[in-house]
Amino acid sequence: MTIDVKSKEILSNLKSTDPEFILETIDKIRESGNRFIVAGLIDLLHETDLPEIKKSVLNLLSELKNKESVPVFIEAIQDEKYAGVRKELVACCWQNGLTYNEYLPVFIDLVINEEFQVAFEAFTVIENMFGRIEDEIIDKEIVKVKDALTNATEQKAYLLNGLLAIVHDIPEEQEFND
């Protein structure tokens, strides 16, 4: 997929030095976001120091419904460049309700290896996960979690034990509570 002219223009607008113009651009993205623009938003989130822009970007990322953005989120979460906004990016994953089931190992690694706040957000993604996951993957991840339990802090042990309780029961279809 190549980047279209409109997306190039939006990405360019996100690099403006005018905060109001950036906020207007973010509002326009709600109607026409694609994976290239999501990557630009993640860059903006990482680079800006302006709270109102961070809030606007996070609101948009947490409302995304474009499944093409899932690999963009995963790539950013795994990139050390974005370590400073990793917690927020992981939170957006459970908030936007997109399907991350094929990335179960990524989120389990986050629970195991990251500081508690990121680990908690990753746990929440797994808790809200749905879709078919191969038994071999689940079995491999359970072994990883059990290994991590041997030298986990009390807080991490709580999350890891929680994973052991839920990972076998990830539903194949999204469940809606009334």
Regions found by a protein language model. Give the residues of each.
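Generic surface-pattern signal
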Residues: K15, D147-T150, E154, H168, ...
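Amphipathic alpha-helical scaffolding segments comprising HEAT/armadillo-like alpha-solenoid repeats
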Residues: M1-N13, S32-H46, N66-D79, L98-I112, ...
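A generic hydrophobic-segment detector
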Residues: V106-Y158
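Structural detector for internal amphipathic alpha-helices that build alpha-solenoid repeat scaffolds
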Residues: M1, F21-G33, D43, K54-N66, ...
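Short inter-helical turns and helix N-cap capping residues of alpha-solenoid HEAT/ARM repeat scaffolds
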Residues: T17-D18, D49-L50, K81-Y82, E114-E115, ...
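Short linear motifs at secondary-structure transitions and domain/linker junctions
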Residues: K15, D49, E63-N66, K81-K87
